[in-house]
Amino acid sequence: PRSTLFPYTTLFRSPSLKAYGISGRARLFEAVQQVKKANAERLRKAPGHKFTGTSSDAIELAAHPELELSYITAVPRMAHYMEHSTRIYNIYLKYIAPEDIHVYSIDEVFIDLTHYLSSSGLNAREFAKRMIQDVLETTGITATAGIGTNMYLAKVAMDIVAKHIPADENGVRIAELDEMSYRRQLWSHRPLTDFWRVGRGYAKKLEEVGLFTMGDIARCSVGRSNDYYNEDLLYKLFGINAELLIDHAWGWEPCTIADVKQYKPESNSVGSGQVLHCPYDFEKARLIVREMIDLLVLDLVDKGMVTDQIVLTVGYDIENLSDPVRRKAYKGQITTDRYGRQVPKHAHGTANIGRYTSSTRLVTDAVLELYDRIVDKSLLVRRLNISANHVICEADVPKENKVEQLDLFTDYAALEKKKEKENAALEREKKMQQAVLTIKKKFGKNAILKGMNLQEGATAKDRNAQIGGHKA
């Protein structure tokens, strides 16, 4: 067992590193800090308080307290992981029909085994183990499985229970939960953030009113109307989302894989975001926004989609407050980030384009006007998120059917001519976008670049070589 990390956010950390308090998705700097703490403790216990060497092998480290803990920092290979993910999915298809599999992420699937157990003569644990064994023999990769009477319990069984039980001789961990065993085992479990769909924000709100466990939430949901702790308190905190939280506190989940497959959202959005590798000033961050718009709009064109609204969120860097000069100059609101550090409150706004479009020109004009209006020019930027809302198929754009009051002073012929000219320009732009997409698909995303992509600080060229923000 080796101590292994993937920069910059850990996609995975080995169980060996987990033993030293490093979480699964720690930032690399957090992992470095935790390793320093671990080595300080090892040095205190080492013979003569000196290290004689280093090791990243857990067994060797356990046997030799005089060795300093080290670790391997491995660069992610997302294309390689996706290839293996596809291979594993195809193994599942040997046992399960695709309509009974929901791909949740690159390394997780939900499977409905209900209709397969009687015909196979196996119980759920045996069936899961057979598939896991096939994956191991075919790919050399082991797996962890959670079995539950619904999707929520299966997920929690894997995330919380399976990861805390000993593995078998092949490294396989399988855990099972039903509603009653969930309540017995996990109603007192902490922290709440270990549970599916409970983030830091939810946990903080719950803890502020004295609710620290799923058992607390379940008890609160059955409180009397004149009690402080009752379901009204939860609905006041979370609105309609309290219904899902209450269900999960009791181990209930009505949604099935069939429901997931049939679901069609009322509204669609497409977005992208990035954390800059260093703080950017106003103008350099504006360049990144232009690049992100360009890629976002090309994605819309490729999918035959259009939008009429863009949402922009700009997060500021901690240096704005850690630098005494900058802090003295800043007079705005201050918030705390997920690491407990003070930062200026982020900028957030919406640009309404006025028509459904996938025009780079129209979207860029609208978003840059918004950026110039909401972003503090004196602050350093660290995070950018752009989302296209109300996304629909181009063929579904509603036809204009507006009634207009005519007057004697407007040149309607000139207006019509202007409209025709604008439509012709948009059509030319679309043909150019489609040509760009054709070239990129044939020769690679960096086969054709704009001048802005070569400016100092531009990130599009590097990001084109990534998958999901990680090296391909």
Roles of regions detected by a PLM:
Residues 1-11:
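Short, small-residue-biased leader/transition segments that mark boundaries at the very start
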Residues 3, 143-147, 308-312, 382-385:
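A short glycine-rich, hydrophobically flanked beta-strand micro-motif that places a catalytic Asp/Glu
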Residues 9-257, 413-472:
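Gly/Gly-Pro- and Ser/Thr-rich, intrinsically disordered tail segments characteristic of DNA damage-repair
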Residues 149, 316-318, 390-392:
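Glycine-rich beta-alpha junction loops
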Residues 174-177, 192, 270, 351, ...:
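Short clusters of hydrophobic/aromatic residues that line enzyme substrate/ligand-binding pockets
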Residues 194, 202-381, 401:
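DNA-contacting surface of Y-family translesion DNA polymerases
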Residues 340-472:
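Acidic, metal-coordinating catalytic segment for phosphate/diphosphate chemistry
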